[in-house]
Amino acid sequence: MDARFLGLESMFTTLGINSAKTFQMWYNSGLKGRETQGLNIAGCQYAPAQADFTAEFLESTGVIKTMATIVDLNSEPLARGKEVEIKKHEFQIPRQKVKVNFGENDMRKQIIELNKADANARLGGNSPYATVRDFIANRLYDSLAEIPDQHVQRLNFLRGQMFGKHEVTLDADNNQSGIALTLKSAVPDGNIVTEQWYTTASDGAVTYVESADPILTIKKKTRALRNDHYHGYRNITVEMNASTFFTVVEHPKVLQKLGYLVRPEFELVTSNDSKAQTLGKQKLLSMSDELLKEWFKEAIGADELLIDSTIVGAARLDSSSKKFVTDAIDAFPVGVVLVRPSGIVSDIFNVTPYRPDAQDIYTNIFEGRGIIEYFYNARQREQTWISEFTALPVLTRPGDMYYYNVAGKTATYTPVVSPSGNPKAQGYYEKSSTGEYVLTEDTDVQSGKTYYTKS
């Protein structure tokens, strides 16, 4: 069989996709479901589609109700209005695209495979037509499935970064061959706190800051928000990356509280703290993840605890191998704890795509918020599908988002080779008798003494 006689030079022709209507029907029946597979847009809702690329929204603060004025029998109170602080925020909405090509070499490989399928079918006494058609349908599905999958991954990244870092930075690491920019939210600087609970070394080893108390810190914040009727709120969600969560629950102060839960009498004597930590670690190992999350949620006073484990892939061209490699990126960054109102706190602003005329072959995606267009270059014998989806999750309650940057890098101390000058002025360290590194007080280099630089 010559596969060309069945019109297999075009996957669309074989499957009868020759108009926008038939393309839409095929997409809805096969690929539409992938638009929500693995999608994490918790706390978001789609805003109405718009024509321009500028997102605008208004943010208002709470209003404290004032008391009535007490006057004498014949006096009138002063008329007064109500002042509500309203802020206007603007953002630019970036466009994302995916391109899938199917060229002559791909077609030739396909025809070779189809001829093999035809021969096998004939040997078995079967009709080759169903085999060929199924092959084409699967090949098209696998090729175009990349489009909704990649848009889902990008949306996950935008949501995770905006919620976890209160901004999105696009660079060569996560958007190679695309634009480089930073999209900032309107979260006030005062809502962002750096309070290290642990540090991580280059080899992944974790060192806990024992003076920190993660549960107490978050508990005080959730309690303060519930009691603040002006800037606070009642229903509270705490969100963090899964890696952050499982690191935090092994903090000595957290293990201590878990141990006291098992043996409440330990709390009567301070010297029992270490025993409680040991007991807490044993309890931690025996608890299921779901039970642990529920206990932690209750301990910090949250109504909802979201543990984000979404991983997205970033493709980049390796300069040495000249091949594309995929790097894994945490959508919600590690080392951040977010305290926010439960429910919707973000609108996904989206721009209506400019649709071609009725002669073009295209399909709507993501409920009409994006499109996939089909092009065929007869001269180059190349089929191309290009998608367009313009969307950005924007924090619409930025003043209610509170961030704790809780992870740091473990310091490394490197010996100074042939030190000279003033060690103290140069910020050198020395090792104390207890093994700790402390800033030196030496103003002259002491013979036989080792000095260190901190990094």
Give the residues covered by each predicted segment.
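N-terminal alpha-helical "arm" segments
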Residues: 1-56, 402-403, 411-413, 455
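Assembly/oligomerization interface modules of large self-assembling protein complexes
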Residues: 40-123, 179-182
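Helix N-terminus capping/helix-initiation residues
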Residues: 74, 101-103, 241, 288, ...
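A structural detector for beta-sheet-dominated domains
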Residues: 87, 94, 101, 115, ...
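Long, contiguous amphipathic alpha-helices that act as assembly "spine/axial" helices in icosahedral shell
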Residues: 91-191, 210-245, 381-388
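Extended, solvent-exposed, turn-rich assembly/linker loops in the middle of proteins
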Residues: 176-295
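Sequence/fold signature of self-assembling virion shell proteins
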Residues: 255-439, 443-450, 454-455
